[in-house]
Amino acid sequence: AYKKEVNTKTKPELYSFLKDIHDYACVYYQYKTEYENQSDFVWSDYKNRLLLILDNLDTTTFNPYVLKVLKESPNSAEEKFFNLEKFLLQRFIFDGTTKNYNQCCEKLLAVPNDKAYLSEYMEESPTTNESYKVKFRKLNNSQARLILFLVEMLLRKGDESKFNDTLKIDKFSLEHIMPQKWQAAWMTVSSYDENGKLVPTSNIELFNRNREEAVKSIGNFALLSSKLNSSISNANFETKINGKVASNKGGIKKYSSS
C-alpha cells in the first residue's frame, strides 16, 4: 500500500509527504522522550498518564492515534486522551477482549467523534459487571503495579508537594502481602472465599485453590519503594508488616509510599 501510494505522487507531492513524515517523527520523538525522562508522575499530566497506561498494559496499537491527536488536535488532546484512557481501563478491568484493537484504532483515526465511537465499540463488544471480580484475582505483577500506581497518583492529586518521594513506576516494587510461598508461615491463617465464607482446612484442595487465587488478587498487593528481604517477604503477617528490628530488616510499613 505504501509503494502504491508513493508511486502515484508527483515530485512536489513527495516532498510534501516527506515533510509530513518528518513532522510526525519530531512529535513522536518529543512525546516519547518526555515520557521516558519523566521522574515524577502527577495525575494532572494527562499525556504522560495515558502513555504510562499504554506502556504498562503493553498496548502499542493506539500509538498512531495518540500521535495524530498530538500533531493535529493538541487543543483537544486532554479530552481525547481521557476518552481513550477510560476506554482502555474499562476494557482491562472488566477483562474485555483486545483482539480487535487494530480495527478499533483504524476506525478511531477516521471518525469525527471519538467519544461516540468508543461508546459504540463498548456496546458492540460488551463486558459484564461481574467480570472485574475474576480479573482482579488473576493480575500479573505488571498489571497490579499499574493499578496501585494509578491509585497512588490519584490519592496525591493536588497535594503532591506534601509528599517526600517522587512517583516513577520503575522505582517501585510489588509485594505480595501473603507470599507466593505461603505454605510455610500462613497455613494456620484462616482462608475465606470471595463471598466471605470460611474455607475449611479439611478440604485441602479447595483451601489450596482459594489461597493460590488470593495470592494474585489486587487486595494482596502492596506498592513498596524497596524490595523486601526474602526472610521478611516469606514470613508471617506481623513480620511482613513490621520487619525484624533486631536484624534491621524493614517490612511493608518501612517501605510503603510516604
Spans of model-derived segments:
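Short, mixed-charge aromatic SLiMs
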Residues: 83-98, 172-173, 248-258
